Swiss-Prot record:
Organism: Arabidopsis thaliana
Family recorded in the similarity comment: Belongs to the ARG7 family.
Intracellular or extracellular location(s): Cell membrane
InterPro entries per record: SAUR_fam (IPR003676)
Gene Ontology biological-process entries: auxin-activated signaling pathway; response to auxin
Superkingdom per UniProt: Eukaryota
Identification of the protein by name: Auxin-responsive protein SAUR20
Keyword tRNA processing: no
Coiled-coil parts of chain: none
Keywords: Auxin signaling pathway, Cell membrane, Developmental protein, Growth regulation, Membrane
Ranges that cross the membrane: none
PANTHER family: SAUR-LIKE AUXIN-RESPONSIVE PROTEIN FAMILY-RELATED (PTHR31929)
Length: 91
């Protein structure tokens, strides 16, 4: 049950934007997540301090360097993995 609550909390914080061109609000970072179909998420900048989020960023750097195909930060992992990793930050 706690896992379900943490996933619901993650969905609130990881608000998916439908407009790719909109700017991220202050204190948030836009990232594109997914393997073939990329979805845009807004994550709090505090996630940058989390070791597991830093590992996702390292994976992104290895795959894309500084040339991201979406024009923003792209994290090459399945969407459910991203949600699982980031849902742990709310505990």
């Amino acid at each position: 049950m706690a896992f379900v609550r943490s996933l619901l909390g993650a969905k609130k914080i990881l608000s998916r934007s439908t407009t790719a061109a909109s700017a991220a609000p202050k204190g948030f970072l836009a990232v594109y997540v997914g393997e073939s179909q990329k979805k845009r998420y807004l994550v709090p900048i505090s996630y940058l301090n989390q070791p597991s989020f830093q590992a996702l960023l390292s994976k992104s750097e290895e795959e894309f360097g500084f040339d991201h195909p979406m024009g923003g930060l792209t994290i090459p992992c399945p969407e459910d993995t991203f949600i699982n990793v980031t849902s742990r930050f709310q505990r």
